[in-house]
């Protein structure tokens, strides 16, 4: 079991709070080298500013695209604030360099318990 640090920008504190409150039960990240080897049973150490919260990963999935991920996982468990699927894209594209990272690496989905 390993512990991995996942940082939320202060501007994204709402998403950090959704993890803490149990509303966001699936954390996703671009499948870059930093995230692609994370396994079930590992822990994610969520950090936002000085706040830290830890969750255990129940399972891990890799998707080549947002479409592939949304065909299998409910978007409300990934981005509870999203109003619809189009909103999911808008939120993802708002993160720095995410479009390019997802197009080249895909997405990792960490189902939390």
Task: Give the residues covered by each predicted segment.
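Contiguous surface segments at macromolecular interaction interfaces
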Residues: 70-113
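Compositionally biased, charged N-terminal/linker segments
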Residues: 1-38
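Short beta-strand-centered aromatic/proline hotspots
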Residues: 52-62
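Catalytic phosphate/metal-binding cores of nucleic-acid and nucleotide-processing enzymes, i.e., regions
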Residues: 30, 34, 54, 77
